[in-house]
Amino acid sequence: MGQPAPALTPLPFELVEDDGEFLETEWHVQQLPLLRETILRAMAEMGRTKDYYTGTNMFVYYSVEQAAEVAREVAENLEPKAFRGPDVFWVSGVHKHRRKYWVAWDEGGRLPDLIIELLSPSTARVDRTVKKDLYASVFRTKEYFLVDPDTRKVEGFDLAGRAYRPKAPTAEGRVWSSQLRASLGFWHGVWMDDEDDWVRLFHPDGSLLLTKAEAAEQKAGMESQRAEAAEAELARLRALLDERSRD
């Protein structure tokens, strides 16, 4: 596995942006934007708007030799064996501009500080072995999370040397992320019109970190309650005045 290194200028091949591979299930497709949105919301709550990057289902190039192998596999329509990228990743201390892919040598050698993989029967073994070793020994990713939609379980790991140490989950099965300052855990509810068990972020006090739509709905509900309370108080005062006027 090659270490991040300066690239040849220009590269003798084109970096691949998409290899046409699809996510395993509709759950996987819908879960990615939910995680991305809530990570963005977590950052906003910390006052961070431009000094990080969150990617989903995006190619991550950590060495020229890996990039060349990906390009060869795609060009020759070979079985994908070279590393493509994680399901979700987060990098701290970089500019938050749009990217087609993450290229380590264009980012000062920076690689993800946090990675989340959504398991499936076809990827679980690689996520638990090959990718886990890559993220620990080459990427040096500080936190690694595995999400199993079948068992509704989240596993978390902290980097310790060149290996990962398991994190202890809470009684609710949630796992703390020091990078995001939030816990990852399953939540049953509706997302994108589908009721299911989704992976969400939770505040340190255990409350759910809301999406933008949920926050707007909550705000509207509170404003409606205040309006109803004000109307009720006004009606009470009017009734009191009417009663006094009759006296």
What is each residue range found by the language model?
Residues 53-55, 145-148:
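A structural signal for short, well-ordered beta-strand segments and their strand-loop junctions
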Residues 46-48:
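Short loop/turn motifs that connect adjacent beta-strands in outer-membrane beta-barrel proteins
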Residues 1-24, 28-29, 33-44, 60-86, ...:
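C-terminal interaction segment
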